[in-house]
């Protein structure tokens, strides 16, 4: 039997094939029909375009017997070898599938015709139509940024953590929320996220052994009984473990965030559900920031007697608005270099009226948090926000303190070409000995791909530097304050800001050049990523011991000045973390201790020792 196969548009182009006894899936590749030929066989969806007739040479014959779709494969078009091996399950028609999913009907006389085809329609869901065909009726700046790329930028990506409901766009200050106990003394984004936040806190507890050890100690004594601590720090799962530890030690706490972008909303909700007065949410405005601090301090029937600060904003606010509170405050514990600098300024001016503990310069903070935490989190923050590859990139790191050292080491290990700027000749020499080229920022600003500040200073990167940067240069800050980069100078009419991701802005110049600004110049790692919990355990334990020390110190031990944590306490913090590594300390013999002039139980180094 001879079978002739042809399409109306490409009859002469159809190659000869042999049809064997194969399954439809196996037979499809054997048909050898070109895409054009197959397309020509299929009638246009909806009957085709009546205003675009086929050329005369390709038009089908006039209607008549054997014409129409069934005639697209007529015996007169051409010949193919006899299909001797084809099996027929139907005595009248044999179905054979084409490549495009249509069917050919083989009649008893050998004519192959195209079967009527079912047009497949893709179901469009309502939300899909809105996303692609409509502009959302209500888009806030933050909701739009989340919808663009939530999973790669948010610190904890989860449907439980972020919602796109209209309620999410309502300011927490305008909401009336209560926890399960009916308490409303808090202000968070959404109290319903508490369960998710509680799971994050429980995970963090597994990596914070020292704080958990302090809680066990609290079962027998309450060293912070009667303490009323007002705190202003980053509100993360690690901070929550610290706050609950302080509560277990007997303290009452009220808390606000020290950074408008670093708060984990679900963690804040979990703390509020547990009864902690927390006033913080991710994405606060400047007005919200100070309002939250004021709500922690200005409370009827409650007055703080201890301050735990990170950056000095809480201390500054109390000095400015409620100076009389310092009559009952026993001390200040400050974590960051920015806040410590402000404390030393107050002390130098004779305005510091209570003792202050400088946690930032303690050994356990400097050598662990500032170095190891930043070494890991700088890469995490950059990767989540930009998806960049580090190998071969030219990076300038401004400042070679412990934070700068960690950033440089991480980037160098990933293959980046790293430059360093520094004002201190000792730190500068360290950078050179570590293999980094010491430069002035002006010397490399036109060529670098990334600029990272970690100095604790102001206007390290000026508008002049920003104007001279190359197109698509990434600019970010690893210091506490948002003053290191002169972001204010970029808010001018001639420059255009585009939010492309959460915490990622393109600042565009009139000539089309743009820079990529991360977290609006605020702390990159806690605004855009996460930090290693174990390292933060060391810092949080140091803060807790500093609070215990100042609160219980006899009158006269500490004057109105700034102090470092006693060396013995630094060593105690370190010892609490050693069991995690199954580490075993060597003990001095009596003879060795006498020879070194040390107590067998420490401290083992003098205060002037540089680790």
Curated annotation (Swiss-Prot):
Residue stretches of biased makeup (Basic residues): 135-144
Gene3D superfamilies linked to this entry: Adenosylhomocysteinase-like (3.40.50.1480), NAD(P)-binding Rossmann-like Domain (3.40.50.720)
Catalyzed chemical reaction(s): S-adenosyl-L-homocysteine + H2O = L-homocysteine + adenosine
Modified residue annotations for N-acetylserine: 2
Residues noted as binding substrate in the record, renumbered to the chain: 236, 310, 335, 365, 369
Binding sites annotated in the UniProt record for NAD(+): 336-338, 370, 401-406, 422, 457, 478-479, 525
Compartment(s) of residence: Cytoplasm; Microsome
UniProt keyword list: Acetylation, Cytoplasm, Endoplasmic reticulum, Hydrolase, Microsome, NAD, One-carbon metabolism, Phosphoprotein
Primary gene name: AHCYL2
Region (LISN domain, inhibits interaction with ITPR1): 2-109
Stored InterPro entries: Adenosylhomocyst_ase-like_sf, Adenosylhomocysteinase-like, Ado_hCys_hydrolase_NAD-bd, NAD(P)-bd_dom_sf, S-Ado-L-homoCys_hydrolase_CS
Enzyme Commission number(s) from the entry: 3.13.2.1
Name of the protein in question: Adenosylhomocysteinase 3
GO molecular function: hydrolase activity
Organism domain of life: Eukaryota
